[in-house]
Amino acid sequence: MMLLKRCNRRALVALAAVLLLAACGGARELPDLSDVGDGVATETLWTASTGSGSASSAYALVPAVEGGRVYAADSNGRVTAWDAESGERLWRVDTGRELAAGPGAGGGLVLVGARDGRLLALDAENGEERWVSGLSSEILAVPQIARNIVVARSGDGRVYGLDGLTGRRLWIHDRSVPVLTLRGSSSPVVVGNRVVVGQDNGRLVTLNLQDGEVIWEAPVSIPRGRSDLERMVDLHADPLVFRGVAYAQAYQGELAAVGMGDGRERWSRDIPGHTGMAADSRQLYVVDDQSRLWALDRNNGATVWRQDRLQGLRLTAPVVIGGHLVLADEEGYLNWIAPDNGDLVGRDRHGRQPIQRPPVPDGDVLYLLSADGRLAALRLVED
């Protein structure tokens, strides 16, 4: 079930209705996939525990791979670093806070966001605290760092630029948010000297990394309907920037391709969703709100194929690795899809806990984090 957040009392009735419908809806009917084999062969290089795992599906706790290390965090405040090749634990620290987002890694820092609005920067070498900066509300988006500027987004929609050395605030981008939004935030994407942010009002904005000034802003989806619930068009999925084009998808709205140079829409499709996207040289892959996986021509948005057999499962965003397409799900499976025709070529299970965040690819290795905090490094085994 998608979690929602209220900005004021006007949304109380709508929120109560959503919760009532969810409670009365009963168990979902899961698809029968018993005929699907194991698919793409993988070998487990190593496994480890991050600690307690994630306390909420709204939390953006996802592994980060940087400089031959893997970093991960749990809700209870622990942040850990492992050697990416061997799985040897290099350090672990307890921040003493309930963590909800991260880590982001780069520039010698490991960045995590907390429920109380604190952004923590740790030394990537040993986990020692470098600095702490207070934002305006809980942090549910993965912090980013580029050119010694940390970019973080708070749950109330504000985007911050902070000095990577000290945590001092350099700029803030502040936009009002709708009365009712999904709980959680899309993470900002940094490309060169630009920051791309999907906003809760259905608009995609690009900011200057150095000063936070708006370069362009483009509507992806326009709110429609009479109630606050009907008008929700959060850009909840992380934006994807690929070869000069930004892709964004709205909850209860559209999927759009926008040129990074001028902010003009290239094409738009009525494919609502909130999970995420991936791309390769030819196609864009996206999951819609019915857990159907689409492959679209990146140039014009035309449908190449659609895979419907995973309907009923809660899926992660798709990931492209080694010429393969893979999505994880709530049952602990990796679902392997043929990029050329969309066939479901295999499923393999990695525990019985939900996998709520997409696997993280690095070369021919996937890093997989389950909701209970089990971290696994899997290598593709080619025939």
From Swiss-Prot:
Record key words, sorted: Cell outer membrane, Lipoprotein, Membrane, Palmitate, Signal
InterPro entries, alphabetized: BamB (IPR017687), PQQ_b-propeller_rpt (IPR018391), PQQ_rpt_dom (IPR002372), Quinoprotein_ADH-like_sf (IPR011047), WD40/YVTN_repeat-like_dom_sf (IPR015943)
N-palmitoyl cysteine lipid sites: C24
PROSITE patterns: PROKAR_LIPOPROTEIN
Segment forming the signal sequence: 1-23
S-diacylglycerol cysteine lipid modification positions: C24
Any single GO CC term annotated in Swiss-Prot or TrEMBL for this entry: cell outer membrane
UniProt cross-references to Pfam families, sorted A to Z: PQQ_2
Entry superkingdom: Bacteria
Entry annotated with the keyword Membrane: yes
Membrane topology, record value: Lipid-anchor
BP GO annotations: Gram-negative-bacterium-type cell outer membrane assembly; protein insertion into membrane
Entry keyword Signal: yes
Annotated localization: Cell outer membrane
Protein family: Belongs to the BamB family.
Job of this protein: Part of the outer membrane protein assembly complex, which is involved in assembly and insertion of beta-barrel proteins into the outer membrane.
PANTHER family: CELL SURFACE PROTEIN, OUTER MEMBRANE PROTEIN ASSEMBLY FACTOR BAMB
Subunit composition and interactions: Part of the Bam complex.
Protein name in UniProt: Outer membrane protein assembly factor BamB
Record organism: Alkalilimnicola ehrlichii (strain ATCC BAA-1101 / DSM 17681 / MLHE-1)
Encoding gene (name): bamB
